[in-house]
Structure formats: structure tokens, C-alpha cells
Amino acid sequence: MQTLVDEETGPFISDAIHYGLMRYKNEFGHRDLGYPFLDLYSEYSQREVGMMANYRNTHSSFRGSTLQNELGGAHYFLFIDLHKDEDIEESINYKDKFVNQKQFQWESPNSTKVDSDRGRDLAQNKVNGKTIHLFVRKYKTVNNVTQRYTYIGRANAISYRNEKPIEIQYQLENKMPIDLYQEFEPEKLVF
């Protein structure tokens, strides 16, 4: 506490706090992003999302495709790699893709059954009061550098099929900008 009132270091600390607040205001403005404080189409790591969602375990423990918020379990965070490694096993080569700017097809992990609690939450999220957040990246790594995920926003299941894995069609709450859509799905022409 003495450092905060110290005549030499106090002004430096005050300047650093002021700078941080001004930088935040310039980047995000005064808008309320709402829980879990995610900015649409911004990039995040799984660790950052875990911290913003108040995930209680160590942030390396939720590696994989889903992270369920522990505070009431009302939010699911899906982390998706669109392009898998060429040597990936067929059993985990999920058929995840953007159908169009408003729809995404996602396959659950092989361990998720349609009649399990998690399966029902993912395939019937609105009925079960669950919120689905989609995070997508083209590749896991580029030049040995782990890539960040782009937050696509909230999504709601509109249909599902198969017992295990479950293929779910999600309707995006926000239509993706055309440039971002074509970055993720360059082979699909949009007129």
C-alpha cells in the first residue's frame, strides 16, 4: 500500500492505470458486451475464453472441442478447427463447416451420445436453456504457431441427426460478414 502513496512511484502507477483505461475505451468503447464479455469476430485463445467465462480449473484442462461453464452450466463454448491435419484418424475427422453465412454444421466428439445430458444440451440448446458460443479457426497451427480462434457468436441448434457423433446444424444469431465467411470457406462463391 505504501507504493501507491509514494511520491515517486505513485504517479507512474496512476499513469499506467489511466493508459490502460484509455486504451480499453479506444478499442471497445462504452458498449456492454454482456457475459461472457466476448467481442463478435475478435480472436481469442481457449485460455482467454476460459478466464472470461470464470472457468475454475486450470486453463490447460479444457483442451478439446467444448468447454462448459461451471457457473450453472448454461454456456457451452465450442472450439472448432475447420481444416484437420492430413494424417488425422478418420474417427476424429469431424465434418465441421459453414453451410452459409448464417448456418454452421458441427459434429460432436465421438464420446457424446444424443441421449446424454451433454448431447441433449448441444442438440436442443434452446429447449434446455443453454447458450452455444462458436469459436472457429482455419488451422490449428501455421508455421508451428498455434492459431487463435475467431468468435463467431451465439448459435442455436435447428436440427440434428445421428446417435454418435451427433451432426448438429446451428443457426448463427449474427450473419457473418462476407469477407470473413469467404476466408473460412474460400471455395464457396457468394453472389
Where are these regions (language model features)?
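Compact mixed alphabeta submodule
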Residues: 141-191
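Detector for methionine-enriched segments
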Residues: 1, 22, 51-52, 88, ...
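Generic hydrophobic, helix-prone segments enriched in Leu/Val/Ile
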Residues: 13-25, 78, 106, 122, ...
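Acidic, glycine-rich low-complexity segments with interspersed aromatic residues
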Residues: 35-148
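C-terminal helical accessory/scaffold domains
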Residues: 1-37
